[in-house]
């Protein structure tokens, strides 16, 4: 439905309706349970030697010789999804979003008793990035080979597939993967600034080196590493990652040079030009635009930056309004399609990544709008301006974010939770090698490449292991979902699907416990950003 200002009565009615819907949703879902389970998922995806405190007991050590042939230690990190390749670009994006999630809602994560687990999830990734960044101008961007890996169905503990490692360097650049890794380490450095200052400093050092590498030696990483093209091709190029990394480094350091970079290159790199309707591991423009708009609305800039930051904000609000279906001009592509049940729909394969990322961006932006509406910034007030007229206030933007979260948790036509392990109905046949085969600790009998397909992949029954906290690819544009291991487009889960939901679940847990329903749609702000002060508004 397109929004029009037709009077105060209608506006008040819309806000009251949004508040009522949000209050009803709060009563339906246990967000604290969702938070706990979402963090378990990252333990299921761990590669390397598992720690003594490992809670996902059906996993064991794996990938213990990664990097050995190349003479580097690349043990650790995360498997991206249901296979066993370690892809650097989506892994780094996962860590960036986990970190941003904590920077916005870390106080709520701490209040729920899950801060230590969230920090562990981030550090498991950043410890690996430190290993992978072996020289100032060298980054190991992939371990394993997607082609050989996808021909096998094995537990990671039994892997017989290639563990070839691939790097980017001065001769074979990869500005996108280096830029995203810089962003991840910069964002994580803020997260650890108070709790582990030495580690925070180390992360920031790597982030600055990686950004310099990405900017000086420019090129797409899939041109340097051909093996990644069929799996995580950098379709959007590397300009968005350079802007993204610069803004995260500005947030981490406060240095004007990084903001100057994002402003000076805004037009050439597409930051103020692209009107985007998706945000993902590949396409970062919406995130860039929202980070830049935050600076404007908080007044954290010099006067010479204002004009460019205003244009960033215009594009940020195009994305926000597109997710709400409120851009009244620009044609059919100006808004994101919705399923009959209300799910944002971008494309068939792993659509849930766009849903969860949109929910987080809308929620964060609603906080920024609320701050601007309170007069704390200089960005023109607390209403997002949509293309073709009309707008959306902070409460409405937040209600739209919450609607997507609740869809994931089961408020949908099928009544199915797409967060595995949550609710009465959730996917039982997740496309996930380790989850679909008897645990290694229960049966150490070797399972070969083809044997896994013969004995486990084609089984009709549920997986023997529940990969708790995974968010699967989800339903199609008509809300249809087929729970079948072979249906990888819908039943495979990825780390970057769950990452933005960690903070969202924590924040919604707090709001659902508050007595006044009006607070659930006006602001979600905490004081945990940017320095992880970890106080909670109650």
UniProtKB/Swiss-Prot annotation:
Gene3D superfamilies: 1.50.10.10
Protein's GO biological process: cell wall organization; cellulose catabolic process
Sorted UniProt keywords: Carbohydrate metabolism, Cell wall biogenesis/degradation, Cellulose degradation, Glycosidase, Hydrolase, Polysaccharide degradation, Secreted, Signal
EC number of the protein: 3.2.1.4
Chain intervals for the UniProt region annotation (Disordered): 513-538
Annotated S-S bridges: none
Listed name of the protein: Endoglucanase 16
Source organism of the structure: Oryza sativa subsp. japonica
């Amino acid at each position: 439905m397109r929004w029009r200002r037709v009077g105060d009565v209608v506006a008040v009615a819309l806000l009251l309706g949004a508040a009522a819907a949000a209050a009803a949703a709060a009563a339906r879902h246990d967000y604290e349970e969702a938070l706990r389970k979402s963090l378990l998922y990252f333990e299921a995806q761990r590669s390397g030697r598992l720690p003594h405190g490992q809670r996902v007991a059906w996993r064991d050590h794996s990938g213990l010789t990664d990097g050995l042939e190349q003479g580097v230690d690349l043990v650790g990190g995360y498997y991206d999804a249901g296979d066993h390749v370690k892809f650097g670009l989506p892994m780094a994006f996962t860590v960036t979003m986990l970190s941003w999630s904590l920077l916005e809602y870390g106080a709520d994560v701490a209040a729920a008793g899950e801060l230590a687990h969230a920090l562990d999830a981030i550090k498991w990734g950043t410890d690996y990035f430190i290993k992978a960044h072996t020289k100032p101008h060298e980054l190991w961007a992939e371990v394993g080979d997607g082609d050989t890996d996808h021909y096998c169905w094995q537990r990671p503990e039994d892997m017989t597939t290639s563990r070839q490692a691939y790097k980017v360097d001065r001769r074979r650049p990869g500005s996108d993967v280096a830029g995203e890794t810089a962003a991840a380490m910069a964002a994580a450095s803020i997260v650890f600034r108070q709790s582990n200052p030495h580690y925070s400093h180390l992360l920031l050092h790597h982030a600055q080196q990686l950004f310099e590498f990405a900017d000086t030696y420019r090129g797409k990483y899939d041109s340097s590493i051909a093996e990644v093209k069929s799996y995580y091709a950098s379709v959007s190029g590397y300009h968005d990652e350079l802007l993204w990394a610069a803004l995260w480094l500005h947030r981490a350091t406060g240095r004007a040079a990084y903001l100057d970079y994002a402003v000076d290159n805004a037009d050439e790199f597409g930051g103020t030009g692209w009107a985007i309707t998706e945000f993902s591991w590949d396409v970062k423009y919406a995130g860039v635009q929202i980070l830049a708009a935050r600076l404007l609305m908080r007044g954290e800039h010099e006067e010479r930056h204002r004009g460019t930051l205003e244009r960033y904000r215009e594009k940020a609000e195009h994305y926000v309004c597109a997710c709400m279906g409120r851009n009244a001009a620009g044609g059919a592509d100006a808004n994101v399609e919705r399923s009959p049940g209300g799910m944002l729909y971008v494309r068939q394969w792993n659509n849930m990544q766009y849903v969860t990322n949109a929910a987080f961006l809308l929620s964060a932006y609603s906080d920024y709008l609320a701050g601007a509406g309170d007069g704390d910034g200089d960005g023109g007030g607390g209403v997002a301006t949509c293309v073709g007229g009309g707008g959306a206030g902070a409460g409405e933007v937040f209600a739209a974010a919450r609607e997507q979260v609740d869809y994931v948790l089961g408020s949908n036509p099928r009544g199915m939770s797409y967060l595995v392990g949550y609710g009465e109905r959730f996917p039982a046949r997740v496309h996930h090698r380790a989850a679909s085969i008897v645990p290694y600790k229960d049966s150490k009998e070797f399972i070969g490449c083809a044997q896994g397909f013969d004995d486990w992949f084609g089984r009709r029954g549920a997986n023997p292991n529940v990969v708790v906290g995974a968010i699967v690819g989800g339903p199609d544009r008509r809300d249809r979902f087929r729970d079948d291991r072979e249906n990888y487009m819908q039943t495979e889960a990825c780390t970057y699907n769950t990452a933005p939901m960690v903070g969202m679940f924590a924040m919604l847990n707090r709001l659902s416990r508050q007595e006044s329903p009006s607070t659930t749609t006006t602001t979600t702000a905490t004081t945990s950003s940017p320095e992880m002060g970890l106080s909670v508004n109650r």
